[in-house]
Amino acid sequence: MNILKNNNVKYIRIRAWVNKKEEKGKPLGGGNNNKETTIFLIERAKKLGFKVLLDFHYSDFWADPAKQNKPALWKDLTGTQLENKLYEYTKDMLLTLKEKNISPDMVQIGNELNGGMVWPNGKTWKQGEESIGGYEGFVGLLNAGIKAVKEITPTAKIMIHLADGGDNELYRRVFDQITAKKVDFDIIGLSFYPYWHGTF
């Protein structure tokens, strides 16, 4: 982080995973960003004077357009129960950070949400006879996370984040839907990797 600070980086983006272990307790790797690790990294960043973007994946590992796996501890939850769990999880993390006086400056509700989040409940399309998912399920989960942010860290900016940053049609499709449903957010975030996504 000192190298970043010395090169005028202003913001640090730190991810949060729910339960970074296999069933037998072995860490999954990839940085092991459970609650404790996430808090440790935010403390380091804040001490160095960075602003912090906290990126909630709402998964036990990487969440991206190909996989938005529901955390194992939440596997039996659906509907309002799942929304409440996501709200409580978000609130718990933010309360802990607030108590340590290291609240994030921006909060990202989900990661690379091209097809929604916390599948299958928050998947943006329904398949076959499934009665879950669709934009209703997705927006319900987004709003649950946003509610926690508004309650605990009301000054933090709220980001909704997609991948494929050069795909105008994708961004219009997703953001037209969520803005029509009155999702309250401040910033559109995007991932853009020229190797995969080409150029603008």
Question: Whereabouts are the PLM-identified features?
Answer:
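Substrate-binding cleft and catalytic face of glycoside hydrolase catalytic domains
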Residues: 3-134, 138-157, 163
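Aromatic- and acid-rich polysaccharide-binding/catalytic face
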Residues: 105, 111, 156, 160-164, ...
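Conserved N-terminal glycine/acidic-rich loop preference
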Residues: 142, 168-171
